């Protein structure tokens, strides 16, 4: 079913993007897509004071984390099993804005991002386009990060074998009140809604992953599908539930 959005119909680039992702013009739509400074951005028209949401792998917070974020000592790296001589092939089944996928790719993993919502997929594709063209990170980004648009459940069933790790970060109601999380989560939950079928992701993820499934959860959330993980890596506000199938080597 086509998604209604507002956009400048006089701007050929926007018209092309919306046609590609089957987004239909609606003068009364809550969300607007803009293309400014070679960047696609999403805006909530009900909250005009909020900045637009973009996917940016080249500058800002993700670039800072790539350079100064702790490398393979980060909790997410430990959770997916990154260690010397081991760089897993990962499917990120709930890509969102691609931040976790980018961290893993920057540490050497090959990552396929799966995103079902066409507006979010359009933002991801735009972010990848700019990253692929970047002199500093473009070469390895083209090698290690790709986008698959479709429902996670469908995608996990159809993706080729040879996947070491499936990473899941289902949408969950956030208690965090930080400005960034509030802004992005408000927009995301209005646009996408909660992942009501998230519990159904675990079984196909376990079937696809040859080594392990990693589920990122807020520290107050229950286990996905009520299944107890093999091990848990805790951070300040989140935890990584790890379901191990076989050893990393």
From Swiss-Prot:
Give each disulfide bond as a residue pair: none
Subcellular location(s) of the protein = Cytoplasm
Q: Which SUPFAM superfamilies match?
A: S-adenosyl-L-methionine-dependent methyltransferases (SSF53335)
Q: Report keywords, A-Z.
A: Cytoplasm, Methyltransferase, rRNA processing, S-adenosyl-L-methionine, Transferase
One of the Pfam families matching this protein, by short name? SAM_MT
The record lists the catalysed reaction(s) as: guanosine(1516) in 16S rRNA + S-adenosyl-L-methionine = N(2)-methylguanosine(1516) in 16S rRNA + S-adenosyl-L-homocysteine + H(+)
Which residues are involved in binding S-adenosyl-L-methionine? 99-100, 115-116, 151-152, 169
Catalytic class of the enzyme: transferase
One GO biological-process annotation of the entry reads: rRNA base methylation
Q: What job does this protein perform?
A: Specifically methylates the guanosine in position 1516 of 16S rRNA.
Q: Which family does it belong to?
A: Belongs to the methyltransferase superfamily. RsmJ family.
The protein's name is Ribosomal RNA small subunit methyltransferase J
**Organism of derivation:** Shewanella oneidensis (strain ATCC 700550 / JCM 31522 / CIP 106686 / LMG 19005 / NCIMB 14063 / MR-1)
